[in-house]
């Protein structure tokens, strides 16, 4: 049994062709248990309008984005296994996969890995942080049987 509880929310209009719950569970299980014990993650799949609104509200960016991470911060003295929420925009993920000539499944997996690392406190604001985070993403993706998501940038 998985140590990561997944709450999958399908808030996008078209559900056709989306990864299934088992795939999202596999991707979470590939990253989170390496860093902490039992936890719960909500993954909400949204359309561009919701992604755009959230990205503008929380990041000041006036466009939709691939993944937003919202870590849960429990009040002092309360311990809960809730790690946080990932908001993933279907259209942006599909467009990026096509533009970057990546298999769609691999790009979905990468967005879950990338967002999960943000929930765990990793970031890519400065070069050192970015290098560490990208290295972890690559290691995790390779362990799950996918290619290095940054291979095109390294060539």
Swiss-Prot record:
Query: Is Lipoprotein a UniProt keyword of this protein?
Result: no
Q: Where is this gene product found? A: Cytoplasm
User: Which key words tag this protein in UniProt?
Assistant: Cytoplasm, Endonuclease, Hydrolase, Metal-binding, Nuclease, Ribosome biogenesis, rRNA processing, Zinc
Please name the GO terms of the biological process aspect recorded for this protein, alphabetically: rRNA processing
Q: How is the cofactor bound?
A: Binds 1 zinc ion.
- Write down the superkingdom of origin: Bacteria
Q: What is its main location?
A: cytoplasm
Molecular function, one GO term? metalloendopeptidase activity
Q: Which Gene3D superfamilies match?
A: Metalloproteases ('zincins'), catalytic domain
Which cofactor does the UniProt annotation name?
Zn(2+)
EC number in record: 3.1.-.-
* Cellular component annotations (GO), alphabetically ordered: cytoplasm
- The UniProt record gives the binding positions of Zn(2+) as 114, 118, 124
Which PANTHER family does UniProt cross-reference here? Answer: ENDORIBONUCLEASE YBEY, CHLOROPLASTIC
- Tell me which family the UniProt entry assigns to this protein: Belongs to the endoribonuclease YbeY family.
Q: What does this protein do?
A: Single strand-specific metallo-endoribonuclease involved in late-stage 70S ribosome quality control and in maturation of the 3' terminus of the 16S rRNA.
Q: What is this protein called?
A: Endoribonuclease YbeY
Query: What would be the name of the gene that encodes this protein?
Result: ybeY
